[in-house]
Amino acid sequence: MYAVIKTGGKQYKVAAGEKIKVEQIAADVGQEIVIDQVLAVGEGSSIKVGTPLVSGATVTVTVLSHGRHDKVRIFKMRRRKHYQKRQGHRQNFTELQIGAIVG
């Protein structure tokens, strides 16, 4: 069984037992969270697609860790104008373990 969930403005296709990294969620490590923004639920060849959400469908996840992604380096330059700008960014993430999918 799989589900398409929405968290942090992004959509993820998940199945029970998987680990995913999502945008940072304000939760403690080891805490269980119920995600109710389920866009679709499928099992085998049957699929339920919500309009926009599947009513009554939930996904239970466990917070494994918090961290930061690798640095993304931004470099801007205007040719012949002696303008160069460097910038770096590290995005925070939360690693989740997918538990039960109800739907």
Curated annotation (Swiss-Prot):
GO terms for biological process: translation. Signal peptide: none annotated. GO terms for molecular function: rRNA binding; structural constituent of ribosome. It comes from the Bacteria. Pfam families: Ribosomal_L21p (PF00829). InterPro entries: bL21-like, bL21-like_sf, Ribosomal_bL21, Ribosomal_bL21_CS. Keywords: Ribonucleoprotein, Ribosomal protein, RNA-binding, rRNA-binding. GO terms for cellular component: cytoplasm; ribonucleoprotein complex; ribosome. This protein binds to 23S rRNA in the presence of protein L20. NCBIfam families: L21 (TIGR00061). Belongs to the bacterial ribosomal protein bL21 family. Part of the 50S ribosomal subunit. Contacts protein L20. This is Large ribosomal subunit protein bL21. It comes from Polaromonas naphthalenivorans (strain CJ2).
